[in-house]
Amino acid sequence: MKKLLLSLTLLVSCGAFAQEGPTMGWSSWNTFGVNISENIIKKQADAMVSKGLDKVGYKFINIDDGYFGGRDKTTGQLLIHPTRFPHGMKTVVDYIHGKGLKAGIYSDAGHNTCGNYYNGDVIAKGVGLYEHDQQDADFFFKELGFDFIKVDFCGGDGPQNSERLTLDEQERYTAISKAIENTGRTDVRLNVCRWDYPGTWVHDVAFSWRTTHDIYDGWASVKGILSENLYLTAYAYDGKFNDMDMLEVGRSMTAEEDKTHFGMWCFMNSPLLIGCDLTKIRTSALELLKNEDLIALNQDKLFYQPYVAKKLNGCYVLVRDIEELNGKRRAFAIYNPEDAQRHLKVNFADLQLGGSVSLRDAFAQAELGSFEESLDVTVPAHGTRIYIADAEERLERVRYEAECAYISDYQEIRNNQSERTGVYENADFCSNGAKAGWLGYSEKNDLIWKNVYVVNDGEYKLTIGYISGENRNITLHVNDAKIQTFSVNSGGWQTVGRRTINVQLQKGWNKVRLSNSSNWMPDIDYIEVVKVPTAVSPLSGASSEAGKDEIFLLNGLKMKKQNKSSKAIYIKDGKKYIN
């Protein structure tokens, strides 16, 4: 089985490709807070190189809050802290670049930083980007040469700044993005730190965006962040990424928890910013952070976040394509958030893998051999297993869960009911334990599957699993064409109904969209897509006498219909169809 490897050659000689992956590096905040210095930053850069982290893809040394020294009262020029960085910031940036690394910086979308409000860093008052967007962007990226910026929002969130200044997130981050663009730099990575998923607009202005509140060094934090990100699959695409926050690997969690933390951050295409002190990192943590199989998954050229394929015995089975869309090679993870070990059987058909399947253990970086039909596995409490799979066949996907679909107006900043924006909710009575709800009342509060793939064009049965205790309308669109509007009622808010409609799909990728522009839609559990069997006709000379079998041609194959029954059963692609 071919090893999944992110080699030095790939990282160094194919720089354009490497730059497209999630950001990999180190950030000062988790360990040092505002108590940073020129010496600390330089030592972390030294350690990144001496410990070989740069060789496996870690490139960024990011200076977070704590470097500010106020502003010049006449010119408004941003000043650097006189004692923490006595030689200014250009010296530090040049030092980082001299190591073959990239340099990152921090600011706030408002006047004041989070460190000013929460950490008593009084000198950091008025140092945010607000009213200085272009001046600071020119300073950071043209004069100093930084390559990355994380922009916080304490200064724009009234309860988190002394001015009680409240700003609009979309307006501020769009303006900041424009200021960076105006510098002429096209390689600067903007990270939006609004703590919850800010809205679908962020994809157009940033390279990555935070999806939760700050991580802390503890299992409860990691578990909570994973829970928040399981159903954000649809929002990471085209080389833009959901940011699950900096890494706490190598601090106080158990070895198994560290593996889950790092492994799932890699598997879910989150940026990888180490947060521990690299000069004191444990050997075991360093080895984990340098796992090339996991890093290769994180930096895979498709840059698609995995989706939850199955929930089994309290565990989540997530899967994604790697290297090639809809190919025979996939990766899957089994994540156990529970406080006890779990035994489960993963059926390869649920992962669209057919025939003999060869597996590689990404944590162990070892081949496991070939398996048929399923994998029996025990996952320890708080543990994760990640596999790279090569299958003989790629099966056609039938079910697409609603919690993996895209909501055009999705956001997590404001109350979704008052804003009339959809959400993803846990629901034990649904097929995979979750659903999409609070949909409708505008065309943008819709539900879209952009990745419905079929091998052949033609007529398909599209079944919608829905939940509604009253009559509600759905308008179905396929590939941007309106198909029909219909009313449904499942008879209760914990009962899943099914509505099937025949639609035409094109070979390859299709888009299925559900909407209701004037009222609430039902909650949605899933859609299923199944090919309608091609028309059949009796062979010349075949008997049609009652009680005799009739012989039919189906896709060039001889099939039998038993006349003693009023129904015919056809087998196509290993599936039964009744006519």
Model-derived segments and their meaning:
Residues L273-E338, N416-G440, I448, G508:
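Glycan-recognition and catalytic regions of carbohydrate-active enzymes
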Residues P22, I40, Q44, M48-N161:
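Aromatic-lined carbohydrate-binding/catalytic grooves of carbohydrate-active enzymes
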